[in-house]
Protein backbone atom coordinates (compact mmCIF):
# COMPACT_ATOMS: atom_id res chain seq x y z
CA UNK A 1 0.00 0.00 0.00
CA UNK A 2 1.37 3.41 -1.00
CA UNK A 3 2.19 5.63 1.95
CA UNK A 4 1.39 9.34 2.14
CA UNK A 5 3.06 12.12 4.08
CA UNK A 6 0.99 14.51 6.19
CA UNK A 7 1.46 17.11 3.42
CA UNK A 8 -0.08 14.97 0.66
CA UNK A 9 -3.32 16.95 0.36
CA UNK A 10 -1.33 20.19 0.46
CA UNK A 11 0.80 19.08 -2.50
CA UNK A 12 -2.29 18.17 -4.51
CA UNK A 13 -3.90 21.53 -3.74
CA UNK A 14 -0.76 23.20 -5.10
CA UNK A 15 -1.11 21.27 -8.38
CA UNK A 16 1.72 18.82 -7.82
CA UNK A 17 2.25 15.87 -10.13
CA UNK A 18 2.45 12.89 -7.77
CA UNK A 19 4.50 9.73 -8.38
CA UNK A 20 5.40 6.58 -6.47
CA UNK A 21 8.82 6.97 -4.86
CA UNK A 22 9.96 3.97 -2.85
CA UNK A 23 6.39 3.19 -1.85
CA UNK A 24 5.53 6.82 -1.05
CA UNK A 25 3.14 9.08 -2.98
CA UNK A 26 5.40 12.09 -3.51
CA UNK A 27 5.44 15.29 -5.64
CA UNK A 28 7.80 15.07 -8.64
CA UNK A 29 7.11 18.72 -9.56
CA UNK A 30 4.53 21.48 -9.20
CA UNK A 31 4.49 22.50 -12.85
CA UNK A 32 8.10 22.93 -13.95
CA UNK A 33 11.00 20.88 -12.63
CA UNK A 34 13.39 23.27 -14.40
CA UNK A 35 11.94 26.36 -12.72
CA UNK A 36 12.07 24.63 -9.33
CA UNK A 37 15.73 23.72 -9.85
CA UNK A 38 16.67 27.32 -10.68
CA UNK A 39 14.52 28.63 -7.82
CA UNK A 40 16.62 26.68 -5.33
CA UNK A 41 19.93 27.68 -6.94
CA UNK A 42 19.00 31.38 -7.11
CA UNK A 43 16.63 32.03 -4.20
CA UNK A 44 14.94 29.38 -2.03
CA UNK A 45 12.72 26.35 -2.41
CA UNK A 46 11.22 23.82 -0.03
CA UNK A 47 10.83 20.06 -0.20
CA UNK A 48 8.63 17.65 1.70
CA UNK A 49 11.08 14.99 2.88
CA UNK A 50 8.80 13.46 5.48
CA UNK A 51 9.35 10.06 3.86
CA UNK A 52 12.82 10.03 5.42
CA UNK A 53 13.15 8.01 8.62
CA UNK A 54 14.19 9.57 11.94
CA UNK A 55 15.58 7.09 14.46
CA UNK A 56 16.42 8.07 18.04
CA UNK A 57 18.93 5.98 19.99
CA UNK A 58 18.94 5.99 23.80
CA UNK A 59 21.22 4.34 26.32
CA UNK A 60 24.35 4.69 28.40
CA UNK A 61 26.41 2.88 25.73
CA UNK A 62 24.97 4.54 22.63
CA UNK A 63 28.30 6.12 21.65
CA UNK A 64 30.07 2.75 21.91
CA UNK A 65 27.27 1.25 19.81
CA UNK A 66 27.73 3.83 17.04
CA UNK A 67 31.53 3.40 17.12
CA UNK A 68 30.84 -0.23 16.21
CA UNK A 69 27.97 0.39 13.76
CA UNK A 70 29.29 3.22 11.57
CA UNK A 71 32.32 3.58 9.28
CA UNK A 72 32.85 7.22 10.21
CA UNK A 73 33.75 7.97 13.82
CA UNK A 74 31.23 9.50 16.21
CA UNK A 75 34.20 10.40 18.39
CA UNK A 76 34.33 13.51 16.16
CA UNK A 77 30.99 14.57 17.70
CA UNK A 78 31.71 16.35 20.98
CA UNK A 79 29.37 19.36 20.88
CA UNK A 80 25.61 18.97 21.32
CA UNK A 81 23.85 19.22 17.96
CA UNK A 82 26.87 18.42 15.78
CA UNK A 83 26.26 16.05 12.87
CA UNK A 84 28.25 13.58 10.78
CA UNK A 85 27.65 11.98 7.38
CA UNK A 86 28.55 8.29 7.35
CA UNK A 87 27.93 4.90 5.82
CA UNK A 88 26.59 1.92 7.75
CA UNK A 89 28.26 -1.25 6.47
CA UNK A 90 27.67 -4.99 6.46
CA UNK A 91 30.49 -7.40 7.41
CA UNK A 92 31.55 -7.57 3.73
CA UNK A 93 32.09 -3.79 3.67
CA UNK A 94 29.01 -3.14 1.53
CA UNK A 95 26.91 -0.05 2.20
CA UNK A 96 23.65 -0.89 3.97
CA UNK A 97 22.77 2.81 3.91
CA UNK A 98 24.25 6.29 4.07
CA UNK A 99 22.91 8.48 6.83
CA UNK A 100 23.39 11.49 9.08
CA UNK A 101 23.97 11.04 12.81
CA UNK A 102 23.38 13.86 15.33
CA UNK A 103 24.90 14.04 18.81
CA UNK A 104 22.17 15.14 21.23
CA UNK A 105 23.72 14.01 24.53
CA UNK A 106 25.93 11.18 25.78
CA UNK A 107 22.90 8.90 26.09
CA UNK A 108 20.95 10.20 23.07
CA UNK A 109 21.93 10.26 19.38
CA UNK A 110 19.61 10.81 16.39
CA UNK A 111 19.89 9.18 12.94
CA UNK A 112 18.21 10.25 9.70
CA UNK A 113 18.16 7.36 7.22
CA UNK A 114 16.77 6.86 3.73
CA UNK A 115 13.11 6.08 3.09
CA UNK A 116 13.66 3.18 0.69
CA UNK A 117 15.92 1.38 3.18
CA UNK A 118 13.75 1.95 6.26
CA UNK A 119 12.82 -1.67 7.00
CA UNK A 120 16.27 -3.20 6.52
CA UNK A 121 17.91 -0.31 8.39
CA UNK A 122 15.63 -0.66 11.40
CA UNK A 123 16.13 -4.42 11.46
CA UNK A 124 19.92 -4.15 11.21
CA UNK A 125 20.19 -1.35 13.77
CA UNK A 126 17.90 -3.22 16.15
CA UNK A 127 19.89 -6.44 15.85
CA UNK A 128 23.19 -4.70 16.57
CA UNK A 129 21.78 -2.53 19.37
CA UNK A 130 20.98 -5.55 21.56
CA UNK A 131 24.67 -6.08 22.39
CA UNK A 132 24.91 -2.53 23.76
CA UNK A 133 21.54 -2.33 25.52
CA UNK A 134 20.54 0.61 23.30
CA UNK A 135 16.86 1.46 22.80
CA UNK A 136 15.93 2.11 19.15
CA UNK A 137 12.96 4.44 18.62
CA UNK A 138 11.56 5.17 15.17
CA UNK A 139 10.01 8.66 15.22
CA UNK A 140 7.03 8.16 12.94
CA UNK A 141 5.39 11.10 14.72
CA UNK A 142 7.70 13.51 12.88
CA UNK A 143 7.50 15.22 9.50
CA UNK A 144 10.48 16.83 7.74
CA UNK A 145 10.72 19.89 5.50
CA UNK A 146 13.94 20.93 3.72
CA UNK A 147 14.33 24.62 2.85
CA UNK A 148 17.28 25.13 0.51
CA UNK A 149 18.88 27.97 -1.44
CA UNK A 150 20.86 31.21 -0.92
CA UNK A 151 17.90 32.85 0.87
CA UNK A 152 16.61 29.72 2.62
CA UNK A 153 18.04 30.37 6.08
CA UNK A 154 16.78 33.95 6.22
CA UNK A 155 13.27 32.84 5.32
CA UNK A 156 13.22 30.18 8.03
CA UNK A 157 14.77 32.40 10.70
CA UNK A 158 12.01 34.97 10.09
CA UNK A 159 9.52 32.36 11.29
CA UNK A 160 11.32 31.50 14.53
CA UNK A 161 10.60 32.67 18.05
CA UNK A 162 12.57 35.95 18.41
CA UNK A 163 14.35 34.45 21.42
CA UNK A 164 15.87 31.78 19.14
CA UNK A 165 16.83 33.79 16.05
CA UNK A 166 20.34 34.70 17.24
CA UNK A 167 21.25 31.07 17.93
CA UNK A 168 19.76 29.93 14.62
CA UNK A 169 21.69 32.63 12.74
CA UNK A 170 24.97 31.45 14.30
CA UNK A 171 24.32 27.74 13.72
CA UNK A 172 27.24 26.22 11.82
CA UNK A 173 27.08 23.76 8.94
CA UNK A 174 26.33 20.17 9.84
CA UNK A 175 24.92 21.19 13.19
CA UNK A 176 21.42 21.31 14.66
CA UNK A 177 19.51 22.89 17.51
CA UNK A 178 16.14 22.53 19.16
CA UNK A 179 14.10 25.68 18.66
CA UNK A 180 10.53 26.82 18.13
CA UNK A 181 8.54 28.87 15.68
CA UNK A 182 6.75 32.14 16.43
CA UNK A 183 3.61 30.03 16.82
CA UNK A 184 5.23 27.79 19.42
CA UNK A 185 5.91 24.79 17.13
CA UNK A 186 8.84 22.70 18.38
CA UNK A 187 11.47 22.45 15.63
CA UNK A 188 14.65 20.41 15.27
CA UNK A 189 16.59 22.73 12.96
CA UNK A 190 19.57 21.20 11.12
CA UNK A 191 21.89 23.15 8.81
CA UNK A 192 22.15 20.29 6.34
CA UNK A 193 20.72 19.48 2.92
CA UNK A 194 20.81 17.49 -0.29
CA UNK A 195 21.12 20.24 -2.91
CA UNK A 196 24.58 21.75 -2.52
CA UNK A 197 22.95 24.98 -1.34
CA UNK A 198 22.80 26.38 2.17
CA UNK A 199 19.62 25.93 4.16
CA UNK A 200 17.89 23.94 6.85
CA UNK A 201 16.31 20.52 7.18
CA UNK A 202 13.55 20.86 9.76
CA UNK A 203 12.11 18.00 11.80
CA UNK A 204 8.78 18.85 13.44
CA UNK A 205 5.63 17.18 14.77
CA UNK A 206 3.40 15.85 12.00
CA UNK A 207 0.40 17.78 13.27
CA UNK A 208 2.30 21.07 12.86
CA UNK A 209 3.74 20.39 9.39
CA UNK A 210 0.92 21.84 7.27
CA UNK A 211 0.84 25.09 9.25
CA UNK A 212 4.62 25.51 9.03
CA UNK A 213 4.63 24.68 5.29
CA UNK A 214 1.95 27.31 4.72
CA UNK A 215 3.92 29.84 6.77
CA UNK A 216 6.90 29.24 4.49
CA UNK A 217 4.64 29.69 1.46
CA UNK A 218 3.48 33.01 2.89
CA UNK A 219 7.16 33.98 3.21
CA UNK A 220 7.48 33.49 -0.54
CA UNK A 221 9.32 30.16 -0.41
CA UNK A 222 8.17 28.09 -3.38
CA UNK A 223 7.66 24.32 -3.26
CA UNK A 224 9.96 22.02 -5.22
CA UNK A 225 9.52 18.34 -6.05
CA UNK A 226 11.72 15.28 -6.10
CA UNK A 227 12.66 15.89 -9.75
CA UNK A 228 14.49 19.11 -8.91
CA UNK A 229 15.91 17.54 -5.76
CA UNK A 230 17.54 14.86 -7.92
CA UNK A 231 19.13 17.24 -10.45
CA UNK A 232 20.30 19.54 -7.63
CA UNK A 233 21.93 16.75 -5.62
CA UNK A 234 23.72 15.28 -8.66
CA UNK A 235 25.09 18.70 -9.65
CA UNK A 236 26.31 18.92 -6.04
CA UNK A 237 28.05 15.54 -6.32
CA UNK A 238 25.83 13.82 -3.76
CA UNK A 239 25.05 10.11 -3.90
CA UNK A 240 21.68 8.39 -4.17
CA UNK A 241 21.49 5.11 -2.30
CA UNK A 242 20.44 2.18 -4.49
CA UNK A 243 21.71 3.89 -7.62
CA UNK A 244 25.25 5.02 -6.80
CA UNK A 245 25.98 2.46 -4.08
CA UNK A 246 24.31 -0.46 -2.35
CA UNK A 247 25.12 -3.34 -0.03
CA UNK A 248 27.40 -4.95 -2.64
CA UNK A 249 29.53 -1.78 -3.04
CA UNK A 250 32.13 -0.54 -0.54
CA UNK A 251 32.72 3.16 0.20
CA UNK A 252 36.06 2.93 -1.64
CA UNK A 253 34.18 1.80 -4.76
CA UNK A 254 31.73 4.70 -4.40
CA UNK A 255 34.17 7.64 -3.98
CA UNK A 256 33.24 7.79 -0.30
CA UNK A 257 36.70 7.16 1.18
CA UNK A 258 36.37 10.52 2.97
CA UNK A 259 33.57 9.04 5.11
CA UNK A 260 35.77 6.23 6.48
CA UNK A 261 37.64 6.73 9.76
CA UNK A 262 40.23 4.00 10.26
CA UNK A 263 41.07 5.35 13.71
CA UNK A 264 43.16 3.22 16.03
CA UNK A 265 41.42 1.12 18.64
CA UNK A 266 38.01 1.09 16.96
CA UNK A 267 36.77 -2.07 15.27
CA UNK A 268 33.62 -1.27 13.32
CA UNK A 269 31.50 -3.61 11.19
CA UNK A 270 33.17 -4.06 7.78
CA UNK A 271 36.50 -2.53 8.84
CA UNK A 272 38.71 -5.50 7.93
CA UNK A 273 37.41 -5.59 4.36
CA UNK A 274 38.03 -1.85 4.02
CA UNK A 275 41.57 -2.14 5.38
CA UNK A 276 42.33 -4.87 2.86
CA UNK A 277 40.81 -2.88 0.01
CA UNK A 278 42.72 0.25 0.97
CA UNK A 279 45.98 -1.71 0.97
CA UNK A 280 45.35 -3.57 -2.30
CA UNK A 281 43.28 -0.97 -4.14
CA UNK A 282 39.62 -1.18 -5.09
CA UNK A 283 38.82 -3.02 -8.35
CA UNK A 284 36.54 -0.22 -9.53
CA UNK A 285 36.00 3.48 -9.02
CA UNK A 286 33.16 6.01 -9.09
CA UNK A 287 33.90 9.04 -11.26
CA UNK A 288 32.10 12.15 -12.45
CA UNK A 289 31.54 12.49 -16.20
CA UNK A 290 30.26 15.18 -18.56
CA UNK A 291 28.97 14.66 -22.10
CA UNK A 292 29.56 17.62 -24.42
CA UNK A 293 27.43 16.14 -27.21
CA UNK A 294 23.67 16.55 -27.07
CA UNK A 295 21.74 13.88 -25.20
CA UNK A 296 21.06 12.69 -21.69
CA UNK A 297 23.03 10.21 -19.61
CA UNK A 298 20.84 7.55 -17.99
CA UNK A 299 21.32 4.87 -15.37
CA UNK A 300 22.54 1.58 -16.82
CA UNK A 301 24.15 2.88 -20.02
CA UNK A 302 27.44 1.09 -20.78
CA UNK A 303 30.67 3.07 -20.37
CA UNK A 304 33.88 1.96 -22.09
CA UNK A 305 37.40 2.67 -20.81
CA UNK A 306 40.89 1.46 -21.68
CA UNK A 307 40.64 -0.85 -18.65
CA UNK A 308 37.25 -2.37 -19.45
CA UNK A 309 33.53 -1.71 -19.26
CA UNK A 310 31.53 0.12 -16.60
CA UNK A 311 28.15 1.82 -16.43
CA UNK A 312 26.34 5.05 -15.76
CA UNK A 313 24.91 5.25 -12.24
CA UNK A 314 23.04 8.52 -11.62
CA UNK A 315 22.70 10.57 -14.79
CA UNK A 316 20.73 13.66 -15.79
CA UNK A 317 20.70 16.84 -17.83
CA UNK A 318 22.15 19.60 -15.65
CA UNK A 319 19.97 22.73 -15.78
CA UNK A 320 22.79 24.85 -14.34
CA UNK A 321 25.44 23.64 -16.81
CA UNK A 322 23.30 22.96 -19.88
CA UNK A 323 25.03 19.59 -20.33
CA UNK A 324 24.47 15.95 -19.41
CA UNK A 325 26.32 14.89 -16.25
CA UNK A 326 26.58 11.59 -14.42
CA UNK A 327 28.33 9.37 -11.96
CA UNK A 328 29.85 6.26 -13.56
CA UNK A 329 31.41 3.19 -12.00
CA UNK A 330 34.31 1.95 -14.12
CA UNK A 331 37.29 -0.38 -13.64
CA UNK A 332 40.31 0.94 -11.76
CA UNK A 333 42.87 2.47 -14.09
CA UNK A 334 43.01 5.17 -16.73
CA UNK A 335 39.93 7.32 -17.32
CA UNK A 336 41.40 9.45 -20.12
CA UNK A 337 39.41 7.94 -22.98
CA UNK A 338 35.79 7.37 -22.06
CA UNK A 339 32.81 6.55 -24.26
CA UNK A 340 29.17 5.85 -23.48
CA UNK A 341 26.82 3.67 -25.49
CA UNK A 342 23.68 5.64 -26.38
CA UNK A 343 21.30 3.60 -28.54
CA UNK A 344 24.20 1.76 -30.19
CA UNK A 345 26.34 4.85 -30.78
CA UNK A 346 29.52 5.41 -28.78
CA UNK A 347 29.67 9.02 -27.60
CA UNK A 348 32.75 10.62 -25.94
CA UNK A 349 32.70 11.52 -22.25
CA UNK A 350 35.02 13.65 -20.13
CA UNK A 351 35.97 12.62 -16.62
CA UNK A 352 35.75 15.56 -14.21
CA UNK A 353 36.05 16.14 -10.50
CA UNK A 354 32.79 16.60 -8.63
CA UNK A 355 30.84 18.45 -7.34
CA UNK A 356 29.93 19.64 -10.80
CA UNK A 357 28.39 22.83 -9.37
CA UNK A 358 29.26 24.78 -6.21
CA UNK A 359 27.57 27.97 -5.00
CA UNK A 360 25.52 27.99 -8.19
CA UNK A 361 28.59 28.02 -10.45
CA UNK A 362 30.28 25.39 -12.62
CA UNK A 363 33.39 23.96 -11.00
CA UNK A 364 36.72 24.38 -12.87
CA UNK A 365 37.03 22.02 -15.83
CA UNK A 366 33.40 20.93 -15.88
CA UNK A 367 32.51 23.07 -18.89
CA UNK A 368 35.68 22.04 -20.71
CA UNK A 369 37.47 25.33 -20.14
Swiss-Prot record:
One of its GO terms (molecular function) is transaminase activity. GO terms for cellular component: cytosol; glycine cleavage complex. Its EC number is 2.1.2.10. One of its GO terms (biological process) is glycine decarboxylation via glycine cleavage system. Keywords: Aminotransferase, Transferase. It catalyses: N(6)-[(R)-S(8)-aminomethyldihydrolipoyl]-L-lysyl-[protein] + (6S)-5,6,7,8-tetrahydrofolate = N(6)-[(R)-dihydrolipoyl]-L-lysyl-[protein] + (6R)-5,10-methylene-5,6,7,8-tetrahydrofolate + NH4(+). It comes from the Bacteria. It is an enzyme of class 2 (transferase). Belongs to the GcvT family. The glycine cleavage system catalyzes the degradation of glycine. The glycine cleavage system is composed of four proteins: P, T, L and H. PANTHER family: AMINOMETHYLTRANSFERASE, AMINOMETHYLTRANSFERASE, MITOCHONDRIAL. HAMAP family: GcvT. This is Aminomethyltransferase. It comes from Xanthomonas oryzae pv. oryzae (strain PXO99A).
